[in-house]
Amino acid sequence: MKLVLGALQWTAFIIAAAIVVPVAVAQSFHLDHSDSARLIQSTFFVLGIAAVIQCLKGHRLPINESPAGLWWGVYTIYAGLTGTVFATYGDTLRGLQGALLVSAVCFFLLSVFKVIDRLAKLFTPVVTGVYLLLLVMQLSQPIIKGILGIGYRQDGVDGLVFGLALVVIAAAFIMTNSNIMFFKQYSILLALFGGWVLFAAAGAAKPIEMPDRLFQLPSLFPFGTPLFNSGLIITSIFITILLIVNMLASMKVVDIAMKKFSKQPDGKHHERHAGFAASFSHLLSGLTGAIAPVPISGAAGFIETTKMPSKKPFMLGSILVIVISVIPFFMNTFASLPSPVGFAVNFVVFSAMGGLAFAEFDSYEKEESKRVRSIIGISLLTGVGIMFVPETALKGLHPVFISLLSNGLVLGTLAAIAADQFQLWRRRKSDNLVSTENKH
């Protein structure tokens, strides 16, 4: 029973965390109901398979997959460029399928030549801590907007939705801090489904759309055979490198979260295996027209909140996602979960991640505090600052630059890596000079 409830909790969390992206992309490309359903289905089918493969043969951690925010940005950018780069929305989607296949090859090559292993060494505690803080800051805007009901039933703040979301948040926090283990471990599941019932009772839930078939597998190249555009190829190579940075950060923070509980990681480094698994998930995404997934750091918050680091419920939950994705009625049912409920639960989950960031900073000796603080200042100023740059200011730039300059999380993390490595290089150089002088 514990395994089943844990699996259902993971399933609900995975779907709630991922449903927004394919729906938003479908709207950007003005897809009809049939094509929208196909995009949503293939995306969940792939992310479920990706999570299982990663947990078994990749990074070997309970990290749920979600459509990559970087790819979401690329899809949105190229939807706006339709008519300029590609003639139609269909051609643009075919070009994006080609970009995912190129990315799959890049993941494979970077894993074969052990580039991923070298990148993993750059994630020192200060870089990981900065990444966590920036993650919470970047997600704070959509989470708060979702809780306020903006864009759910109306464009402005929805008082009813906001009130109901506050009830869900309060209930989730109470259960998370409860002395009753059942409520503590299943707080996310209870909050999601309890919130759903609450919204339905208040008339704020959306109806479930009835499908026209009982079973449906994703189709091969649903938007047509892939197109390979030189600009998209360059973009996909750059995006792959950024996704590796994102993936390594997620592995690091979940590893930290698991060390706080009984389930200890095996101590081995699986970065290359994770890269090969990501290559497969991008290949599958390109073949089925899905939005490629990436391991997300929210899993650390989930583990912190539920105190459940076991892989078995996660594996079963991911398998349930795969099953749900091929049964349209189940997919439509879960897709009708009120988005403010998901945002309310994510508020609780991600609030736990700020503490993980400061724990990373505290792991340094007192003598390092000045260096660490300077890195934090540089990276936060860079990452948070870029979050306030309006998207309209980036129009006309190459999609590669737009992808970087519109993502404060990635840019701030890269700034932290650069500042950290530069200061470590200066210290090594200084130590070598002192050592040479002492010899003479």
UniProtKB/Swiss-Prot annotation:
<keyword id="KW-1003">Cell membrane</keyword>
<feature type="transmembrane region" description="Helical">
    <location>
        <begin position="96"/>
        <end position="116"/>
    </location>
</feature>
<dbReference type="InterPro" id="IPR006043">
    <property type="entry name" value="NCS2"/>
</dbReference>
<keyword id="KW-0472">Membrane</keyword>
<feature type="transmembrane region" description="Helical">
    <location>
        <begin position="283"/>
        <end position="303"/>
    </location>
</feature>
<keyword id="KW-0812">Transmembrane</keyword>
<feature type="transmembrane region" description="Helical">
    <location>
        <begin position="341"/>
        <end position="361"/>
    </location>
</feature>
<feature type="transmembrane region" description="Helical">
    <location>
        <begin position="374"/>
        <end position="394"/>
    </location>
</feature>
<feature type="transmembrane region" description="Helical">
    <location>
        <begin position="399"/>
        <end position="419"/>
    </location>
</feature>
<dbReference type="GO" id="GO:0042906">
    <property type="term" value="P:xanthine transport"/>
</dbReference>
<feature type="transmembrane region" description="Helical">
    <location>
        <begin position="3"/>
        <end position="23"/>
    </location>
</feature>
<feature type="transmembrane region" description="Helical">
    <location>
        <begin position="39"/>
        <end position="59"/>
    </location>
</feature>
<feature type="transmembrane region" description="Helical">
    <location>
        <begin position="231"/>
        <end position="251"/>
    </location>
</feature>
<feature type="transmembrane region" description="Helical">
    <location>
        <begin position="67"/>
        <end position="87"/>
    </location>
</feature>
<dbReference type="GO" id="GO:0005886">
    <property type="term" value="C:plasma membrane"/>
</dbReference>
<dbReference type="InterPro" id="IPR006042">
    <property type="entry name" value="Xan_ur_permease"/>
</dbReference>
<keyword id="KW-1133">Transmembrane helix</keyword>
<feature type="transmembrane region" description="Helical">
    <location>
        <begin position="156"/>
        <end position="176"/>
    </location>
</feature>
<keyword id="KW-0813">Transport</keyword>
<dbReference type="Pfam" id="PF00860">
    <property type="entry name" value="Xan_ur_permease"/>
</dbReference>
<comment type="similarity">
    <text>Belongs to the nucleobase:cation symporter-2 (NCS2) (TC 2.A.40) family.</text>
</comment>
<protein>
    <recommendedName>
        <fullName>Putative purine permease YwdJ</fullName>
    </recommendedName>
</protein>
<feature type="transmembrane region" description="Helical">
    <location>
        <begin position="130"/>
        <end position="150"/>
    </location>
</feature>
<feature type="transmembrane region" description="Helical">
    <location>
        <begin position="314"/>
        <end position="334"/>
    </location>
</feature>
<feature type="transmembrane region" description="Helical">
    <location>
        <begin position="188"/>
        <end position="208"/>
    </location>
</feature>
<dbReference type="GO" id="GO:0042907">
    <property type="term" value="F:xanthine transmembrane transporter activity"/>
</dbReference>
